[in-house]
């Protein structure tokens, strides 16, 4: 179970990781940890790391997804406090916990884990464009944060309820935290994004559906490259 860290954020869009995990895995969420000035409330109990540990939490999950994916300096005291209190740290940010000076030594001394979710696998696979068996659906949108992940999860849940052979394929950090597997495609070297998407959605049975979490938008000047790589690599039927 997690203590969801919200820092001092004011924009609800910045809390999309915490909101996503709470929506789809509420049983994994013990409480929220907010700093002064935070204007986001998930409706969970406000807990200190020590109180969360006592309530059953085993990790502090950084529930914030700021532009650029950096750990704000003002969060570091809370992260260190969480480690000192006995909580492992889970992060979906680009900046790795293991690269932050001093964190690993604290975690090692307490026998705790620093879990960086947004790390690309060591897969240097160039896309072939070969048509694969099985069926695929890729969620797309006109912007970031418009519901591509939620839609993919909802479609997957509905199909599974009807007995369809279906798999949710996470391509972002929050989707991976929710489903327990996937590849954070925005951490992959650009040459290999389509190939990694082929790897993520391999040959499957004739009636099997892969529901693929979309990223960004073709209209977005910053993230369209990831979107296009997903489109080429997933070869969606829908």
Describe the predicted segments one by one:
Residues 1, 9-11, 15-35, 45-50, ...:
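ATP-dependent carboxylate-amine ligase catalytic core
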Residues 90-94, 138-146, 183-188:
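Flexible, glycine/proline-enriched loop segments at strand-loop-helix junctions
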């Amino acid at each position: 179970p997690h203590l969801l860290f919200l820092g001092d954020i004011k924009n609800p869009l910045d809390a999309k990781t915490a909101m996503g995990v709470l929506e789809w895995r509420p049983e994994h969420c013990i409480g929220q940890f907010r700093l002064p000035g935070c204007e986001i409330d998930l409706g969970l109990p406000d807990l200190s790391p020590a109180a969360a540990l006592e309530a059953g939490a085993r990790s502090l999950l950084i529930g914030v997804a700021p532009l650029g994916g950096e750990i704000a300096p003002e969060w570091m005291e809370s992260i260190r406090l969480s480690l000192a209190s006995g909580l492992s740290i889970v992060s979906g940010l680009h900046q790795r916990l293991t690269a932050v000076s001093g964190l690993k030594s604290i975690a090692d001394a307490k026998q705790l884990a620093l879990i960086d979710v947004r790390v690309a696998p060591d897969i240097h696979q160039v896309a072939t464009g070969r048509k694969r068996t099985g069926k695929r659906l890729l969620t797309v949108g006109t912007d970031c944060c418009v519901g591509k992940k939620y839609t993919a999860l909802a479609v997957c849940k509905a199909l599974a309820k009807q007995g369809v052979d279906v798999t949710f394929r996470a391509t972002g950090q929050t989707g991976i935290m929710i489903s327990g597997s996937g590849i954070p495609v925005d951490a992959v070297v650009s040459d290999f994004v389509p190939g990694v998407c082929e790897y993520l959605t391999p040959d499957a049975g004739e009636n099997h559906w892969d529901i693929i979490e979309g990223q960004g938008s073709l209209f977005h000047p910053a993230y369209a490259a990831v979107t296009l790589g997903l489109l080429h690599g997933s070869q969606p039927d829908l």
